[in-house]
């Protein structure tokens, strides 16, 4: 289950920069515990899926997991041994631009200790520093 859009308005996009803190998605909306990003980065769909699998294995079919980010930015890449020019390369992967303060995952229906352990394992799959947040803090 890779997180890629079914249909897009534009097939390629500019690289851009990730600046500032997140404007939305910084509060818990569904679960009691969450994993919050502390650094800016581009998360790939494979990294999100790997973290989701790690969380699901830790919870052992107890509780519910919400994924609060989605990959909607295409990243293009030209093949190896191709000269400069001749247009932009084809889409290599899909990424999600994450700003500091963004909630990545939420868990509900489990104890805080189990959620903290699941997020600790998921954090090792991600390329950024994250923090554990609870409801009411």
Swiss-Prot record:
SUPFAM superfamilies: Ribosomal protein L16p/L10e (SSF54686). Signal peptide: none annotated. One of its GO terms (cellular component) is cytosolic large ribosomal subunit. InterPro entries: Ribosomal_uL16, Ribosomal_uL16_bact-type, Ribosomal_uL16_CS, Ribosomal_uL16_dom, Ribosomal_uL16_sf. GO terms for biological process: translation. Pfam families: Ribosomal_L16. The keyword rRNA-binding applies. One of its GO terms (molecular function) is tRNA binding. Keywords: Ribonucleoprotein, Ribosomal protein, RNA-binding, rRNA-binding, tRNA-binding. HAMAP family: Ribosomal_uL16 (MF_01342). NCBIfam families: rplP_bact. Belongs to the universal ribosomal protein uL16 family. Part of the 50S ribosomal subunit. Binds 23S rRNA and is also seen to make contacts with the A and possibly P site tRNAs. This is Large ribosomal subunit protein uL16. It comes from Anaplasma phagocytophilum (strain HZ).
């Amino acid at each position: 289950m890779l997180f890629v859009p079914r249909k897009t308005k534009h097939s390629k996009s500019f690289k851009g920069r990730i600046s500032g803190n997140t404007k939305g998605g910084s509060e818990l909306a569904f679960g009691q515990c969450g994993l919050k990003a502390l650094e800016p980065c581009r998360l790939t769909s494979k990294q999100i899926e790997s973290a989701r699998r790690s969380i699901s294995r830790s919870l052992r079919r107890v509780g519910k997991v919400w994924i609060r980010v989605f990959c909607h930015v295409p990243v293009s890449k030209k093949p190896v041994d191709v000269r400069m020019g001749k247009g932009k390369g084809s889409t290599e992967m899909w990424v999600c631009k994450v700003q500091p303060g963004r909630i990545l995952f939420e868990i509900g229906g489990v104890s805080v200790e189990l959620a903290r352990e699941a997020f600790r394992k998921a954090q090792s799959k991600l390329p950024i520093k994250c923090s554990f947040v609870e409801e009411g803090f």
